[in-house]
């Protein structure tokens, strides 16, 4: 059985204190603990990582196995990182792009995602619930294999 990877991109380590009007007051640790508990309860392995370094994120994606599932919040890399996009395409695993805020209701540059076209879905605007919904989908996908 595959593993679920939850990869958080730049500045997400500041959740809870970074622009709470846009990203909420929930910390990254709180979000991660909810995800870890839900996956553990379902008996599915999960790995959760955060980085502010694009190359490190790409290395984690490269280490994924063919039966794994990716939940990714690429942060600002969403809008321009063809390197992250190509990494996801290279490993050929299902992926969901997640955002806490509704990127389509924000500044014009945030409305474009170069990552979403290589993902099976995108969930945004629901705060920490965006991650929880993505995990529900990933758990269902992995248990049906």
Curated annotation (Swiss-Prot):
<dbReference type="GO" id="GO:0009423">
    <property type="term" value="P:chorismate biosynthetic process"/>
</dbReference>
<dbReference type="GO" id="GO:0008652">
    <property type="term" value="P:amino acid biosynthetic process"/>
</dbReference>
<dbReference type="GO" id="GO:0019631">
    <property type="term" value="P:quinate catabolic process"/>
</dbReference>
<feature type="site" description="Transition state stabilizer">
    <location>
        <position position="18"/>
    </location>
</feature>
<feature type="binding site">
    <location>
        <position position="79"/>
    </location>
    <ligand>
        <name>substrate</name>
    </ligand>
</feature>
<feature type="active site" description="Proton acceptor">
    <location>
        <position position="23"/>
    </location>
</feature>
<keyword id="KW-0028">Amino-acid biosynthesis</keyword>
<dbReference type="GO" id="GO:0003855">
    <property type="term" value="F:3-dehydroquinate dehydratase activity"/>
</dbReference>
<comment type="subunit">
    <text>Homododecamer.</text>
</comment>
<feature type="binding site">
    <location>
        <position position="73"/>
    </location>
    <ligand>
        <name>substrate</name>
    </ligand>
</feature>
<feature type="binding site">
    <location>
        <begin position="100"/>
        <end position="101"/>
    </location>
    <ligand>
        <name>substrate</name>
    </ligand>
</feature>
<dbReference type="InterPro" id="IPR036441">
    <property type="entry name" value="DHquinase_II_sf"/>
</dbReference>
<comment type="similarity">
    <text>Belongs to the type-II 3-dehydroquinase family.</text>
</comment>
<keyword id="KW-0057">Aromatic amino acid biosynthesis</keyword>
<dbReference type="Pfam" id="PF01220">
    <property type="entry name" value="DHquinase_II"/>
</dbReference>
<feature type="binding site">
    <location>
        <position position="110"/>
    </location>
    <ligand>
        <name>substrate</name>
    </ligand>
</feature>
<comment type="pathway">
    <text>Metabolic intermediate biosynthesis; chorismate biosynthesis; chorismate from D-erythrose 4-phosphate and phosphoenolpyruvate: step 3/7.</text>
</comment>
<comment type="function">
    <text>Catalyzes a trans-dehydration via an enolate intermediate.</text>
</comment>
<dbReference type="InterPro" id="IPR018509">
    <property type="entry name" value="DHquinase_II_CS"/>
</dbReference>
<feature type="active site" description="Proton donor">
    <location>
        <position position="99"/>
    </location>
</feature>
<dbReference type="InterPro" id="IPR001874">
    <property type="entry name" value="DHquinase_II"/>
</dbReference>
<dbReference type="GO" id="GO:0009073">
    <property type="term" value="P:aromatic amino acid family biosynthetic process"/>
</dbReference>
<feature type="binding site">
    <location>
        <position position="86"/>
    </location>
    <ligand>
        <name>substrate</name>
    </ligand>
</feature>
<keyword id="KW-0456">Lyase</keyword>
<protein>
    <recommendedName>
        <fullName>3-dehydroquinate dehydratase</fullName>
        <ecNumber>4.2.1.10</ecNumber>
    </recommendedName>
</protein>
